[in-house]
Design a protein with these regions (language model features):
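Extracytoplasmic electron-transfer domains, predominantly the class I c-type cytochrome c fold
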Residues: 89-143
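Sequence/structural segment immediately N-terminal to covalent heme-attachment motifs in c-type
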Residues: 56-79, 86, 109
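Flexible coil segments in periplasmic/lumen-exposed cytochrome c-class electron-transfer proteins
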Residues: 26, 44-45, 67, 120-158
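C-terminal motif of bacterial Sec signal peptides marking the signal peptidase cleavage site
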Residues: 18-20
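Bacterial N-terminal signal peptides that target proteins for export
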Residues: 1-9
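Electrostatic cytochrome c docking/interface patches
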Residues: 28-65, 157-158
Length: 158
């Protein structure tokens, strides 16, 4: 395993643990570094075209995959509703309905899901999710429900 993969794996394993322990918001310095990093990564795939159309079946398939793999950090609605650590991570977990996220092309969204965003807590899913699952998640991201309209993840309500 390469050093980069080892470090990425360690960050992914430790990030949720540290997020749960964190009692204070990120410092101004942490937030500044995270913001700069987030906005200076190269997101590839701009011209890649999603082979899945926005049909009811494809949206439902994307929702199922999203719920299985993405809901823990992004909430049921993709807008962090009910996720207790979403704002305390550095950088905070973005709302997937935000203009910032929605301005990405479908191919760019797939690339982010494939490769993740280092050094944030966003893991890459290439090898875990199939291309079909990822493309269906992208379809779902284009059709997210209204914030808070589907409730909170049960795992955080206990």
């Amino acid at each position: 395993m390469s050093v980069r993969k080892t470090i990425s794996f360690a960050v992914l394993v430790c990030m949720p643990m540290f997020a749960g322990c964190r009692a204070t918001p990120s410092s101004k310095a942490e937030t500044s570094v995270a913001y700069w990093t987030k906005h200076h990564i190269t997101v590839r795939g701009k011209k890649d075209v999603n082979p899945y159309k926005a049909t009811e079946d494809n949206i439902a398939e994307g929702k199922d995959s999203f719920t299985s793999y993405c809901m823990v950090c992004h909430g049921l609605d993709g807008q962090n509703t009910g996720v207790p650590f979403a704002e305390t991570l550095s950088p905070p977990v973005p709302s997937l309905a935000s203009t910032e996220v929605q301005k990405y092309s479908d191919g760019q969204l797939k690339w982010v899901i494939d490769y993740g965003v280092w050094p944030s807590g966003m893991p890459g899913s290439k090898g875990t999710l199939s291309d079909e699952e990822i493309w269906s998640i992208v379809v779902y991201l284009r059709h997210l429900p209204a914030a808070g309209s589907v409730g909170e993840p049960e795992m955080y309500s206990h």
